């Protein structure tokens, strides 16, 4: 096994592990906000790691530059966290409750200020 194959294998294993952690978080976390956090953080980094391994494989082993993979990595990196944030805000706005043991609600203050300012 060459050094390139070891590096690529490490990226694939890291990506698989992070995706597994995201899947476990989606199942185990008690509310929609925790589940969104698990899905957007660890699963996104897992997908990016696997795509980076794919890019390195084609570039270093086969000598082919696959720009579409780099664009896909950039697209996932930029859009997945924003989509998770928007889904969380939407859930909050329609009244999906926080977990009863949650200790902090940062959006409550912001929405109270907006409601006072609109009157």
UniProtKB/Swiss-Prot annotation:
It is found in: Cell membrane. One of its GO terms (cellular component) is plasma membrane. The keyword Plastid does not apply. It is a multi-pass membrane protein. GO terms for molecular function: sodium:proton antiporter activity. The keyword Disulfide bond does not apply. Belongs to the CPA3 antiporters (TC 2.A.63) subunit G family. This is Na(+)/H(+) antiporter subunit G. The lineage of its organism: Bacteria, Bacillati, Bacillota, Bacilli, Bacillales.
